[in-house]
Amino acid sequence: MRRLRASSDGERGGIAVIVAFLMVMMLGFAALAIDAAKLYSERAQLQNGSDAAALMMAQKCAKNDTDTNCSTTSPLAADLANKNAIDGLSNVKSIALDKTNRTVTVTAGAKETGASANSVSLFFAGILGIPSAEVNASSSVRWGSPVEGTTIFPLAFSICQVSGMVDGAAQLLQNHSADANADCPLGPAGKTVPGGFAWTVQNSGQCGGLVNLAINQSGSDTGNDGPSNCDAVLNKWASELGAGRPVIVLLPVYDDATGTGSGASYHLTSFVAFSVQGWAFSGSDKLPMVYNASATSGLECKGNCRGIIGKFVKYVSLADGYKLGPVSPNGATVVEMTS
């Protein structure tokens, strides 16, 4: 009997169709992998650029809101966006600046020769009819002076020593109970304010404490041995200063004081930036409670002196954890990313 063989010619066309279909799928996956990687890289560069531009603008506005770079035509914004792109090309798509509410949002878009605005060309996806894709990144920043936050050190300065002294000369500031620093009539309704500084209440187990300018701050009594829980902070300050790096801290300012020690109450008005140079918070001559207390002529703090040496400065901080309000004339401002 003769065997009948089925012809395989009919299957050949089917296999070709399957291969063609698989090739299209492979091209699609290649488009997703390679082009997606390009889009991811481009967006990361744009995000860095928009972050840098927004932070720069907020810092400029915090220092001086009439600065040319505190405007929607900021020339430095475009420069920073370009410098954060690998090819040196980007486009500042928009700048939304609100000086009243102290916010700025910078949106950066891609820029590529031959591609449409804010877009990059795609290689594999182009084969599938998608020649380019738009890539943008936005960054929002706000600025202002602190009105609430946790301080790094439990100390508040008198308005007497701050007024007119931001970016001024270094001072030796002592506890107001020592009457070493001049009082002044800068309190509410011209009330006399004790000069120097005051010790404030610390958070449990911490060196600093929560400060809210809307609420009077209670005082504390550290005795002759300085504040507790502050060894690590003071040792770090000494290490930074010894290495030639500045130590600038944000601390509150009071314009009224009643009582003394742990029974005192202080009316706080603002935060100020203080550049620390030395201190003597106990009668010893060793760290952490004493550092560089006799290095500057005329500002020595020896014997019974309990004080801190340094100067008030205009300073923009990137520290987080503060609630912000309008910019204070006392020079301390904070800039923070919001998105």
Which positions does each model-derived feature cover?
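Conserved, well-folded catalytic cores of nucleic-acid-processing
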Residues: 56, 60, 83-84, 142, ...
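Short secondary-structure junctions
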Residues: 82-92
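N-linked glycosylation sequons
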Residues: 66-75, 93-118, 125-339
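Short, glycine/acidic-rich beta->alpha junctions
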Residues: 38, 119-120
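Alpha-helical assembly-interface signal, strongest on the long, hydrophobic N-terminal helix that forms
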Residues: 1-77, 166-167
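Sparse, context-dependent recognition of short Cys/His-centered cofactor- or disulfide-binding micro-motifs
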Residues: 17-19, 24, 31, 91, ...
